[in-house]
Amino acid sequence: MTYRHRHFVFSVPAKTITGWKTEREAWTYRGLDIDPPAALRVDGDTVPPLPPGIERHVVADWNRNLMRSALQEIVALPLDRTAGSVVISRSQTGAIAFDGLGLPGRTVDLDAAVELTIVALEQGADTVVLPVREHLPKIVVEDRSLRDQGIRELVAVGESDYTGSTKNRIHNIGVGLKKFNGHFIPQHSTFSFVETLGSVGPKTGYRKELTILGDKTMPDYGGGLCQVSTTAYRGVWEAGFPIVQRKNHSFAVHYYSPQGTDATIYPPHIDMKFVNDGSGALLIQTYNEGTKAYFLYYGTRDNRTAEIIGPYTWDHRAAPTETKTEYTTDLAPGERKKVGEKVPGMKAQWLRIVRRGDGESIDSVFSAYEARPLFYQIGVAGTGAVLPADAVDPAA
């Protein structure tokens, strides 16, 4: 069973669901529950003819407490949170300052989720849209010039989880998030992630970390910044802003699950852009806590609502079994280095429905992820001669 809320997708394994349901025999007389006469209780599969008005049924009993407990752990635990509060002001230097975090609260209605699950299972459906109550944060904008330009309330939130990241990747994500904190997006302007990000290198505080470079995964300055661009993208995409430019990664990366919600960048060539067509300017607050990253967009909400549906996935391909090898003079002769993991391929599509007043528009986001083999580089002598196989250290 799959549970969805916005871009979040949760799965409950079949073996867990099996324990939720038991079956029992029930008897009724003209629609009322009865205890059947002893003569009608028989061993085996054959039941004697029933008197008029008496019916025998097999009914399902659902263990709602067990279901609620499972959904609490799998769904509510990662989603539920309390609403925050923030005071937005300007410092003496004119810089925008945030005191607090205007993150909205969420509560999964577990009782309603259990009932929806029962209906879905009894009807043979495999997906439940979670009933989630949202709680608005308290936002105080002290600076009058910001209020005059429409900075009044929370408009959109982008979030992602980078659990399992390396130390350098976590560092780069933190540095990248700070570049956008306090960034102001005028009304009717086009926001460019790459332009706002600026230079990426050791002088701007970044470390080398794995980055997708063509058909390889190699260390480069700023590895992990796609976590920041993906977080920024999810917020405006889910809020219904027009997306001008967005590209998925060439292969599926688990940090950006569910697939089809990522936005890769590689300055200066690959960017993420959107148009602020809202009721006023937008102001960004960025934040990270633990392994979660957030983009909060403050502004003035208009009458638009947005709904995202997906992902629809197909063309699932296993990773190639053969190992890809490339010979290079960048490594010492005989040195062996892994530059690509085995990755399965797939295609994914999301639909977005944006409603304004009496009208609505539907757009789709398509992503194609390559299936990739295990990939090694092997060092060769500068003459270009390839070393014999027995001269290569397989443990390197």
Language-model region placement:
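Well-ordered beta-sheet/strand-loop patches within structured domains
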Residues: T2-S11, K15-L50, D61, N65-A396
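Noncatalytic, helix-rich "gating/capping" subdomain that lines the substrate-entry/channel surface
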Residues: G53-I54
